[in-house]
Amino acid sequence: MELPEPELIRQSWREVSRSPLEHGTVLFARLFDLEPDLLPLFQYNCRQFSSPEDCLSSPEFLDHIRKVMLVIDAAVTNVEDLSSLEEYLAGLGRKHRAVGVKLSSFSTVGESLLYMLEKCLGPAFTPATRAAWSQLYGAVVQAMSRGWGGE
Protein backbone atom coordinates (compact mmCIF):
# COMPACT_ATOMS: atom_id res chain seq x y z
CA MET A 1 0.00 0.00 0.00
CA GLU A 2 1.37 3.39 -0.99
CA LEU A 3 1.42 5.89 1.85
CA PRO A 4 -0.37 9.22 1.53
CA GLU A 5 1.59 12.44 1.21
CA PRO A 6 2.46 12.94 4.88
CA GLU A 7 3.34 16.62 4.76
CA LEU A 8 0.15 17.65 2.94
CA ILE A 9 -1.86 15.79 5.54
CA ARG A 10 0.04 17.19 8.52
CA GLN A 11 -0.06 20.74 7.20
CA SER A 12 -3.79 20.69 6.53
CA TRP A 13 -4.56 18.95 9.83
CA ARG A 14 -2.75 21.67 11.80
CA GLU A 15 -5.46 24.10 10.70
CA VAL A 16 -8.33 21.71 11.49
CA SER A 17 -6.91 20.67 14.86
CA ARG A 18 -7.11 24.25 16.14
CA SER A 19 -10.90 23.81 16.49
CA PRO A 20 -11.57 20.06 16.42
CA LEU A 21 -15.05 20.19 17.93
CA GLU A 22 -16.21 22.89 15.51
CA HIS A 23 -14.85 21.05 12.48
CA GLY A 24 -16.01 17.66 13.75
CA THR A 25 -19.51 19.09 14.07
CA VAL A 26 -19.34 20.18 10.42
CA LEU A 27 -18.31 16.62 9.49
CA PHE A 28 -21.23 15.03 11.35
CA ALA A 29 -23.78 17.61 10.19
CA ARG A 30 -22.78 16.75 6.62
CA LEU A 31 -22.93 13.03 7.42
CA PHE A 32 -26.51 13.34 8.69
CA ASP A 33 -27.44 15.39 5.60
CA LEU A 34 -26.07 12.70 3.30
CA GLU A 35 -27.22 9.65 5.29
CA PRO A 36 -30.06 10.56 7.70
CA ASP A 37 -30.65 6.87 8.45
CA LEU A 38 -27.53 6.97 10.65
CA LEU A 39 -29.15 9.28 13.20
CA PRO A 40 -31.07 6.49 15.04
CA LEU A 41 -27.78 4.64 15.66
CA PHE A 42 -26.75 7.39 18.07
CA GLN A 43 -28.56 6.85 21.35
CA TYR A 44 -27.33 7.78 24.78
CA ASN A 45 -29.09 6.69 27.98
CA CYS A 46 -31.88 5.25 25.80
CA ARG A 47 -32.52 8.72 24.40
CA GLN A 48 -33.50 8.79 20.73
CA PHE A 49 -32.66 12.06 18.96
CA SER A 50 -35.48 13.71 17.05
CA SER A 51 -33.25 15.66 14.66
CA PRO A 52 -29.62 16.04 13.64
CA GLU A 53 -29.55 19.37 15.49
CA ASP A 54 -30.76 17.65 18.66
CA CYS A 55 -28.00 15.06 18.31
CA LEU A 56 -25.28 17.58 17.43
CA SER A 57 -26.03 19.63 20.56
CA SER A 58 -26.03 16.65 22.94
CA PRO A 59 -23.07 16.60 25.37
CA GLU A 60 -22.75 12.83 24.84
CA PHE A 61 -22.59 13.22 21.09
CA LEU A 62 -20.09 16.06 21.38
CA ASP A 63 -17.90 13.57 23.27
CA HIS A 64 -18.27 11.19 20.33
CA ILE A 65 -17.17 13.95 17.95
CA ARG A 66 -14.10 14.60 20.12
CA LYS A 67 -13.23 10.89 20.03
CA VAL A 68 -13.59 10.73 16.24
CA MET A 69 -11.33 13.75 15.86
CA LEU A 70 -8.78 12.08 18.16
CA VAL A 71 -8.81 8.98 15.93
CA ILE A 72 -8.17 11.18 12.89
CA ASP A 73 -5.40 12.92 14.84
CA ALA A 74 -3.83 9.53 15.61
CA ALA A 75 -3.94 8.60 11.92
CA VAL A 76 -2.27 11.91 11.03
CA THR A 77 0.38 11.42 13.72
CA ASN A 78 1.09 7.89 12.43
CA VAL A 79 0.59 8.64 8.74
CA GLU A 80 3.95 7.08 7.89
CA ASP A 81 3.32 3.99 10.02
CA LEU A 82 -0.41 3.28 9.91
CA SER A 83 0.27 -0.39 10.60
CA SER A 84 0.93 0.64 14.22
CA LEU A 85 -2.79 1.47 14.49
CA GLU A 86 -4.16 -1.63 12.75
CA GLU A 87 -5.32 -3.53 15.84
CA TYR A 88 -6.84 -0.41 17.38
CA LEU A 89 -8.68 0.41 14.14
CA ALA A 90 -9.91 -3.17 13.72
CA GLY A 91 -11.29 -2.93 17.27
CA LEU A 92 -13.09 0.29 16.33
CA GLY A 93 -14.53 -1.54 13.35
CA ARG A 94 -15.88 -4.28 15.63
CA LYS A 95 -17.46 -1.67 17.93
CA HIS A 96 -19.13 0.08 15.00
CA ARG A 97 -20.41 -3.21 13.59
CA ALA A 98 -21.82 -4.12 17.03
CA VAL A 99 -23.95 -0.96 17.17
CA GLY A 100 -25.34 -1.50 13.68
CA VAL A 101 -23.14 0.67 11.47
CA LYS A 102 -22.88 -0.73 7.96
CA LEU A 103 -19.43 -0.85 6.41
CA SER A 104 -20.86 0.95 3.37
CA SER A 105 -21.63 3.99 5.56
CA PHE A 106 -17.92 4.69 5.86
CA SER A 107 -17.95 5.85 2.25
CA THR A 108 -20.36 8.61 3.33
CA VAL A 109 -18.16 9.38 6.33
CA GLY A 110 -15.26 9.81 3.90
CA GLU A 111 -17.29 12.22 1.77
CA SER A 112 -18.19 14.13 4.94
CA LEU A 113 -14.55 14.27 6.02
CA LEU A 114 -13.51 15.73 2.66
CA TYR A 115 -16.39 18.22 2.84
CA MET A 116 -15.27 19.36 6.30
CA LEU A 117 -11.66 19.72 5.16
CA GLU A 118 -12.73 21.75 2.15
CA LYS A 119 -14.88 24.05 4.32
CA CYS A 120 -12.08 24.50 6.84
CA LEU A 121 -9.18 24.94 4.43
CA GLY A 122 -10.85 26.78 1.56
CA PRO A 123 -8.43 27.33 -1.36
CA ALA A 124 -5.67 25.50 0.54
CA PHE A 125 -7.66 22.29 0.01
CA THR A 126 -5.96 21.53 -3.29
CA PRO A 127 -6.55 18.47 -5.47
CA ALA A 128 -3.28 17.02 -4.12
CA THR A 129 -4.44 17.55 -0.53
CA ARG A 130 -7.80 15.94 -1.34
CA ALA A 131 -6.03 12.95 -2.89
CA ALA A 132 -3.73 12.57 0.12
CA TRP A 133 -6.65 12.64 2.56
CA SER A 134 -8.65 10.21 0.42
CA GLN A 135 -5.73 7.82 0.49
CA LEU A 136 -5.26 8.16 4.26
CA TYR A 137 -8.97 7.69 4.93
CA GLY A 138 -9.04 4.66 2.64
CA ALA A 139 -6.23 3.07 4.63
CA VAL A 140 -8.04 3.77 7.92
CA VAL A 141 -11.27 2.23 6.63
CA GLN A 142 -9.38 -0.77 5.29
CA ALA A 143 -8.00 -1.40 8.79
CA MET A 144 -11.39 -0.81 10.42
CA SER A 145 -13.08 -3.16 7.96
CA ARG A 146 -11.09 -6.02 9.47
CA GLY A 147 -13.45 -5.59 12.44
CA TRP A 148 -16.39 -6.54 10.23
CA GLY A 149 -14.66 -9.73 9.17
CA GLY A 150 -13.92 -10.84 12.72
CA GLU A 151 -10.18 -10.97 12.10
UniProtKB/Swiss-Prot annotation:
Top EC class of this enzyme: oxidoreductase
Lineage summary: Eukaryota, Metazoa, Chordata, Craniata, Vertebrata
Superkingdom per UniProt: Eukaryota
Domain Globin: start-end pairs: 1-149
Gene Ontology cellular-component terms listed: cytosol; mitochondrial matrix
Record's protein name: Neuroglobin
Compartments, as annotated in UniProt: Cytoplasm, Cytosol; Mitochondrion matrix
Coiled-coil parts of chain: none
Post-translational modification: Phosphorylated during hypoxia by ERK1/ERK2. Phosphorylation regulates the heme pocket hexacoordination preventing the association of His-64 with the heme metal center. Thereby, promotes the access of dioxygen and nitrite to the heme and stimulates the nitrite reductase activity. Phosphorylation during hypoxia is stabilized by 14-3-3 proteins.
UniProtKB keywords: Cytoplasm, Disulfide bond, Heme, Iron, Metal-binding, Mitochondrion, Oxidoreductase
Gene Ontology biological-process annotations: cellular response to hypoxia; oxygen transport; response to hypoxia
Disulphide bond pairs: none
